[in-house]
Structure formats: structure tokens, C-alpha cells
Amino acid sequence: MSTPSIHCLKPSPLHLPSGIPGSPGRQRRHTLPANEFRCLTPKDAAGVFEIEREAFISVSGNCPLNLDEVRHFLTLCPELSLGWFVEGRLVAFIIGSLWDEERLTQESLTLHRPGGRTAHLHALAVHHSFRQQGKGSVLLWRYLQHAGGQPAVRRAVLMCEDALVPFYQRFGFHPAGPCAVVVGSLTFTEMHCSLRGHAALRRNSDR
């Protein structure tokens, strides 16, 4: 059985809807640091984990992915990751994998299912020096455009704490109810997002 093709991100203009702050294009070119958006590789794993550890442990005491799991996903499915680099420095990232069930399970935390049609977003984090600048919003919008342009991917899914539900709703995610995944004493809401609209945005931006 053939596996649907998935490709890594190609450089393309970033188009953001109104209400999403932080578009690099709104800054003057002569003051804009060199920005690069690209899929991550295993060589980026240490930098990813450093940002993730600082971002998550300070808030919840847990990391979504340990260093070995970061390397695992960046080896198996780098095309489902996205990093934002400023002057060559990683400042924000998203790591995802494919999932093939309607809802997330405990297994979904560590598995990549190549035949899946769902992009499972495991982690989104921004370096502490670049927070409160809208970079998480820009990166998430860019990622959804990228994932929506993949023939194999039809929707995105993630789990988040209740306080973050309104943030993800701004990007087209809808609550699907309590998530079956539990991490320690933490519980989560599962969020689903159809990528059809994001695919259209990606096609238009490529013209």
C-alpha cells in the first residue's frame, strides 16, 4: 500500500489574517533580522529541547517530549515540524507527527503513523527572549498553511490546558471534549481543526 506523499516546507511569503499580530512583513526591511522558516532536522533537536524544557517545565513541570522523543520525530517525520530562525538562531518551533485515529490516545504521544491523515501537534514553544511578540501566533498560522498544503493531511489535532482553548480557537480549532491523555495530574481539552481553509490560503500564497 502506497503512503501519501508529504514534502518539507519551501520558502514562501507569509500571509496572515487580520487580528493575528507579529507579521514580519509589517516591519521595515532595514530593521528586520533575517527570518527563516524551515522544517527541522535531528541536528536541531538539542536547541528544540532547550526551548521546550524552559517553556514547559516553568509552567507545568512537564515537557511534552523528552530529548530522545524530539530526535525520534525529527528523524521519522521532519516534514511535520517547523522552526523559526532569526539570524540563524532557533527562536520558536512546532513538532508534529501523523495520527490515524479520530481521537488522541496515550499512544499518540510517542507514535508516528505514516498512513494517518491527521497532523498531531505535540509541542509549540517560543524562546523566552522572544515571547510576547506574537511569534507563537505567526508560527502556528504558518504551520497550518504548510500542513494544509500536504496531500496526506486533512486536519490538525492537539491537546491543551483549558486556559489555552481561546488562543487555539482563533486559528480554527474547535474543542472536541476532554482528552483521553493524562500527564501526571494534568488534564487537557482535545482540539480539532480542518485544514481545508488553510490549504486554500497556502495555494493562494504560492501564486
Swiss-Prot record:
Key words of the record: Acyltransferase, Biological rhythms, Cytoplasm, Melatonin biosynthesis, Phosphoprotein, Transferase
Domain N-acetyltransferase intervals: 35-196
Catalytic activity: a 2-arylethylamine + acetyl-CoA = an N-acetyl-2-arylethylamine + CoA + H(+)
EC number in record: 2.3.1.87
Residues annotated for substrate binding in this entry: 124, 159
GO biological process: circadian rhythm; melatonin biosynthetic process; response to light stimulus
Binding residues for acetyl-CoA: 124-126, 132-137, 168-170
GO terms assigned for molecular function: aralkylamine N-acetyltransferase activity
Residues with the Phosphothreonine modification: 31
Cellular component aspect of the GO annotation: cytoplasm
Tissues of expression: High levels in pineal gland and retina.
Compartment list: Cytoplasm
Induction record: Exhibits night/day variations with an increased expression at night. Higher levels in pineal gland in early morning than in early afternoon (at protein level).
Pathway: Aromatic compound metabolism; melatonin biosynthesis; melatonin from serotonin: step 1/2
Protein modification: cAMP-dependent phosphorylation on both N-terminal Thr-31 and C-terminal Ser-205 regulates AANAT activity by promoting interaction with 14-3-3 proteins.
PROSITE patterns named among the record's database cross-references: GNAT
Enzyme class per UniProt: transferase
Family according to the record: Belongs to the acetyltransferase family. AANAT subfamily.
Summary of the function given for this chain in its UniProt record: Controls the night/day rhythm of melatonin production in the pineal gland. Catalyzes the N-acetylation of serotonin into N-acetylserotonin, the penultimate step in the synthesis of melatonin.
Quaternary structure and partners: Monomer. Interacts with several 14-3-3 proteins, including YWHAB, YWHAE, YWHAG and YWHAZ, preferentially when phosphorylated at Thr-31. Phosphorylation on Ser-205 also allows binding to YWHAZ, but with lower affinity. The interaction with YWHAZ considerably increases affinity for arylalkylamines and acetyl-CoA and protects the enzyme from dephosphorylation and proteasomal degradation. It may also prevent thiol-dependent inactivation.
Name by which UniProt lists this protein: Serotonin N-acetyltransferase
Organism of derivation: Bos taurus (Bovine)
Gene name, Swiss-Prot/TrEMBL: AANAT
